[in-house]
C-alpha cells in the first residue's frame, strides 16, 4: 500500500485519468522509459503527483534550473503535505571555479559563498532518504555532482535513544569527528553545547535544536526546541545526528588516501621532470605537499574536493557517488522539461573537464583532480531507474527511447484552449504592441515579450517605461532566486509586462498572462525553432483570452509547424469541450512560493531605496538613522541598526510575538550581508 497521501481539491479531469493509468501501468510493468507529452497548462505536475502516489515509490524530480525546481517543489508540497517533499539545488550563492589562463599566465583561485539555508535543505533531503520511504526530492542538475559516500555518511551518524546509557565524552568526540563545533554561547547549525546534564545540538538538516537531557549517564528525554525562544516543539524517542558535511572520511581511509596521493605526486613529478617542465613540477610539489600536511594535521585542506577520488577510495575514471546513490533500489526518476534537461547532462561533464585539463597540464592539480566531476551522461543513465520524461515538446532522443510509451495529454481540466496565434508585419510593430499592452493592462492582465537580443530587450523596456507602462526586464545576469521574485511580482500585479530573451519559455506557470509577443519570429535559429516557438506560445495557454502575437515579414517552416501544432491541439480541446458541455474557467493558482520565503534570499529592489518592510517591522528605529543621497542606509550606520534590531527581535521573542521576531531575524541577516559587501 502506498505511503503517499495526495491532497487536492479536485479530481483528475480531461485526459489526465487516461495518462495516469497508462503511466502507472508502465511503471508497474517495469517499462524503463515513458514520455508524457503534455501541452502547457494541462496539469502535468498533478498527473505525475498521482503517478507517484499510486506507485508508492521514492521519486527524484529533475528540473533544468532553480526557478523551475522551486515552483515544482512548492506545488508538490501542496499535493503531499504529510510526506517528505525535499528541495536539492546547488548551495552556492556565488561560485568562481579554480582556473588557469595560459595565454596571460593568470591563475584564478576558487572563491565561493555557501548559502546555509540551501545547505540545510540538501542535508534534509539525504536524511529523509535514509529514514523514510515516502520521499520526493525536487532537484536541479547539480544533483549529478559528487556527494560523499552514502554508506560512510550513514555509518558516521551519532544515535541517541531515550533510556539508553551513553558515554557523553565519546559522543562529543563523535560529533567533532563529524565536523560539528562546540560553542557554548552561539548555538546553531553544525554546532553543539553542553550545560550540566543537557546536550544541545544544531543538526545540519534542521533549523531546530535537538536537546538531549541526561540523568547521570542515561538519556532521560530527547526534544526539538526553538533556537531563539527555547520553547519545546516536539518530543522524540530516538534520533540520528548525521554529519555536518556530506563528505565523511574515516581515519583509516584518510591514512590510505594520503599514501595514494603521495604515490600519484611522485609519478606526476617524474613525468614533468622527464618532459622538462620544471616550473610545473615545482608548482605541483609545493601545492600538493602543503595540502598533504594540512590533511595530516586537521584532516582537511582548501580544495580538498580535488582529492575526492583518493579520499573515497575510488578507482581512476570511476563515477562519483551523488544524490542518486542515496536513493533505495526501487525509485522513480521524473525529468521535467526533458528536451532541455537531458541535454544539460552531457554539457555539465564536458565543461568541467576542459577546465580541469588545463589545471593538470600546468601543474596546479594532480591528474586525479579530473575525477572530482559530475556524472557523464551515460553514467547517469546507468544509475537511473525507471524514467518518465515530461515535456510539451520532447526531444527526438526521448521520443525514440520511449517508443510505444508516449502518452499525450492535451485537454486542460479548466477547459481553456490553446492560444489564438496571429502573425503581424514588423512595420509599426512597437506602436501596435503598445496598444495591445494598454488593452491588456486595462483588464488587469499580464504580457510577456520575447526578443532576440539583450540590446533589443533593454531598448524596448526603456521605450515602454517612457510610455508609462509598468515593465520589468528579465535577463541572464539576474540571480536565480531573484528571478523567482520577479515572476512573483508579475503575478501579483506589481507590473504588467515582462521582457526577456531566452528566459520566458519552459516551465513558467503564469495564469495571469493573456498575451505573449514574439518579435522577429521569422529569424530562424535556436530561439525561433519549432520547439522554442511552441513553448513560448504556451505561456499564454493558461488564460481564457490567451493570444500569441508573432511579428514577422516572412513565414518560416518553424512558424508553420508551431502554428499547425497549436491549432491541432486547440481543435482537440474545442471538440472535447463541446462534447462534454464544458465552459472554460480561469486557472486559480495562488501566487505564492514557500521555497522562496524559506530561503531568506529576497533581494527586492525598493523604489525609494529604503526597505519598506524594515520600516514597518522595526517601528521608529530606522528613522533615527541617517540616509545617504540615494535614500539608502549609510553603511556606517548599519552596525548600530543591527544592534537595535537584535534588541527588538529578542523583545518580540520574549513577548511571544514569534512572527515579528522571525521577520526581524530575516532583516538582520540581509543587513549583515550588506555590511560584508
From Swiss-Prot:
ATP binds at residues 38-45. InterPro entries: Helicase/UvrB_N (IPR006935), Helicase_ATP-bd (IPR014001), Helicase_C-like (IPR001650), P-loop_NTPase (IPR027417), UVR_dom (IPR001943), UVR_dom_sf (IPR036876), UvrB (IPR004807), UvrB_inter (IPR041471). CDD domains: DEXHc_UvrB (cd17916), SF2_C_UvrB (cd18790). A motif (Beta-hairpin) lies at residues 91-114. It comes from the Bacteria. Pfam families: Helicase_C, ResIII, UVR, UvrB, UvrB_inter. Forms a heterotetramer with UvrA during the search for lesions. Interacts with UvrC in an incision complex. Belongs to the UvrB family. This is UvrABC system protein B. The lineage of its organism: Bacteria, Bacillati, Cyanobacteriota, Cyanophyceae, Synechococcales. The gene is uvrB.
